[in-house]
Amino acid sequence: MIDTIFALGEGLLAAPWWSAIGWPVVWALIKVTLVLMIVMGAVTYTTLWERRLLAWAQIRMGPNRVGPWGLLQPIADAMKLMTKEVLRPAAAEKFLFYLGPVMTVMPAMAAWAVIPFGPDIALANINAGLLFLMAITSMEVYGVIISGWSSNSKYPFLGALRASSQMVSYEIAMGFCLVVVLMVSASLNLTDIVAGQNKGYFAQIGLNFLSWNWLPLLPIFLIYFISGLAETNRLPFDVIEGESEIVAGHMVEYSGMSWAMFQMAEYANIWLVSVLTTIMFLGGWLSPIDSVMFNWIPGWIWLGLKSFCVVTMFIWVRVSFPRFRYDQIMRLGWKIFIPVSLIWLVVVGGWMQTPWNIWK
């Protein structure tokens, strides 16, 4: 279908420059716009889904007044934020103060350039996609640090210090987890990583979900998911913006769309971590069972459903667990997750050299 649309667009004009330069550029812009619209729509309505789940957990209704069943509540919230004044403290560094939110949201959006939504559906299906993701997602912490420092205020600065140490700590554990997946997949290409989970004994008998990486790499899967909570500053790791300690951390002095950009980055990163979890450990767009009924469903729907379940797990953890102390978070990252992920890196490496290697 995508190839058909591309061919139709290429044939709109007979001029050589159109097929050589014009249409490829227009086609790339269309794909980028479509992906950004999907991501922004998911981010917008994840806020509503989170508020409804929190309400159900607390035995109340949640947003249900704006539109049918409250479905227009996110749009009303967006309109409210767009019309609010963006305030700036008098002592703040003006340029850096406004640069911080931009540097926070841009990596969260740029990372989607290499995310495959199907076997042949990606903005850029590059061989070093995993390496690109590890690099681009590490840049978000700079926006948080700049925002906290440029506000010239006590609470934002403390939040920025916490953010820098927490993100660096858990990025190491996440990096080791991704290295393990890289070892068993023998590729940095995200499409190849998904394809590598569709082989083995269980895949041959139709139980695809048992051939995915989550089962043989279960400790790595759990470490990656929990580290993802810490990377996205979600409960129980939200000491960066702990309301009872430093009000809202690095976002204290922000309002209007500046504050909204931080929220956009947070929820975009939640979806990014969820999609990556699905691609690395849950078979990506592969159906869980090899049957006509399941194979009839398009792969991008399977990817979306699995990612939505992981996002729901993020919200479930928020509503179920209390916030950790800062020293407990650092201890968990440095004394448990990093050593365990390193040990499993060695274990999997040794496993792959034995006759019982299941990733051949």
UniProtKB/Swiss-Prot annotation:
Pfam families: NADHdh. Its main location: membrane. GO terms for molecular function: NADH dehydrogenase activity; oxidoreductase activity, acting on NAD(P)H, quinone or similar compound as acceptor; quinone binding. It catalyses: a quinone + NADH + 5 H(+)(in) = a quinol + NAD(+) + 4 H(+)(out). It is an enzyme of class 7 (translocase). The keyword Calcium does not apply. PROSITE patterns: COMPLEX1_ND1_1, COMPLEX1_ND1_2. It is found in: Cell inner membrane. Keywords: Cell inner membrane, Cell membrane, Membrane, NAD, Quinone, Translocase, Transmembrane, Transmembrane helix, Ubiquinone. GO terms for biological process: aerobic respiration. InterPro entries: NADH_UbQ_OxRdtase_su1/FPO (IPR001694), NADH_UbQ_OxRdtase_su1_CS (IPR018086). The keyword Calcium does not apply. The chain crosses the membrane at residues 20-40, 95-115, 126-146, 168-188, 209-229, 269-289, 297-317, 332-352. Belongs to the complex I subunit 1 family. PANTHER family: NADH DEHYDROGENASE SUBUNIT 1, NADH-UBIQUINONE OXIDOREDUCTASE CHAIN 1. HAMAP family: NDH1_NuoH. NDH-1 shuttles electrons from NADH, via FMN and iron-sulfur (Fe-S) centers, to quinones in the respiratory chain. The immediate electron acceptor for the enzyme in this species is believed to be ubiquinone. Couples the redox reaction to proton translocation (for every two electrons transferred, four hydrogen ions are translocated across the cytoplasmic membrane), and thus conserves the redox energy in a proton gradient. This subunit may bind ubiquinone. This is NADH-quinone oxidoreductase subunit H. It comes from Albidiferax ferrireducens (strain ATCC BAA-621 / DSM 15236 / T118). The gene is nuoH.
